[in-house]
Amino acid sequence: LDDNGGKNIQIISKIESQEGVDNFDEILELSDAIMVARGDLGVEVPAEEVPFMQKMMIRKCNKAGKPVITATQMLDSMIRNPRPTRAEAGDVANAILDGTDAVMLSGESAKGKYPVEAVKMMATISKRTDEFKKFKTVETPGGSDISVTEAISSGAVSTSHALDAKLIVCWTKTGRAPRMIRKYGPTVPIIALTDNEQTARQLALVRGVRAYVAKGLDKTDDFFAKAREIAANHEEANKGDLVVMVTGISKEGTTNTFRVERVGE
């Protein structure tokens, strides 16, 4: 990819075999995201093992700060019926509670009799589950082996929890900053501003992140001004609410600072 102009194309690795599970750590390290393909995986391993493999892969992706998709047979009965079984509804909800970034339909929307209903049902279950329980907090990092971006992201999330902030707004070139913020379990929406359209599209996969393309934010003060504008118009934040703003100062490519402001002040 690098040699043919695709340096910024991201790789989603599909885990569908015992070999993939056995080598998961190495695959995760080289991947930008993971798809847990339960249907194919269930052909090769005992059915009773698949749920635990799914949980393991989601947990490791969360810890690495990389998106994970849970896929296959999530609402399988809706290929034939207009409503899912209660077990299927629970399956979708439990994947979200475990920390998956995305849930994916396949046959339900590709060849089923009720594709629109299946999509609406998955969206309804997802929204309700998010209302029940927000993100899970990952252990705060420590030691000299973590990056500045990760330390700042963790601190921003901890601050948002402590102060009951309503939004986190961050600036990103590559998408790394919002992924690291998501890793540490914020309970509020993450707004990512970027001047790169490809980065904005790629962030659509990251749970809790909404990305906007914003040009002309070359100076730190420009970012803070735009962040204030977005916060003032966001449905989750009212005048007087606190917002955490995360960006980089001086060194491009490094997220190294955050600050807290009140909406409308």
Describe the role of every protein-language-model region:
Residues 1-265:
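Non-catalytic helical/linker scaffolds that mediate oligomerization, partner binding
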